[in-house]
């Protein structure tokens, strides 16, 4: 794969033989972003789990203290009073059968889906579309609920869901390159806390195998997975 001159220059600033602290990695990621727009900052983790085994699945949600830098588009499957509640809460689209039909037709212009429990039978018809994309409402992530107001507010406020893929990897957005270093470290710390809390008891050996921080179209910065405390040490902004 051919990389741009800017990418190669950015990659040259990263010492591949070194594992950086989260504060160092954030600083380096911000310094090496070369795109002309506000790049997204993402953390990728390789976990020591076998997601093919039900007792080693890692999934959950995390509330990013500073949000993702993007207002999530949220749809809600609800009817009657709950539909009105969802509209009042700021949901981008609200409906039942018509929403299902649109998704069956290929529409996927949203970041999260919420449903009241009575709508789940209908949503089952699009589970094969939503599931692989991490968009299927689920009680474990608080997206199958009667409290649609709270669910919409949480997601709009920076709550994101995570789920390990079949290769034992996790990918989570922790903000934008325009965020301050301390904001990005705070968001990284929140993610790390939840990933560690979600460790399955059946997982054996080293849990956090590899952690990398990247910006859109930028090189990865390797983070020391053993640094899980005092994450803001050495941060230029405290």
From Swiss-Prot:
SUPFAM superfamilies: Ribosomal protein L1. Keywords: Repressor, Ribonucleoprotein, Ribosomal protein, RNA-binding, rRNA-binding, Translation regulation, tRNA-binding. CDD domains: Ribosomal_L1. The keyword Signal does not apply. The keyword RNA-binding applies. GO terms for cellular component: large ribosomal subunit. It comes from the Bacteria. GO terms for molecular function: rRNA binding; structural constituent of ribosome; tRNA binding. One of its GO terms (biological process) is translation. Belongs to the universal ribosomal protein uL1 family. Part of the 50S ribosomal subunit. Binds directly to 23S rRNA. The L1 stalk is quite mobile in the ribosome, and is involved in E site tRNA release. This is Large ribosomal subunit protein uL1. It comes from Salinispora tropica (strain ATCC BAA-916 / DSM 44818 / JCM 13857 / NBRC 105044 / CNB-440). The gene is rplA.
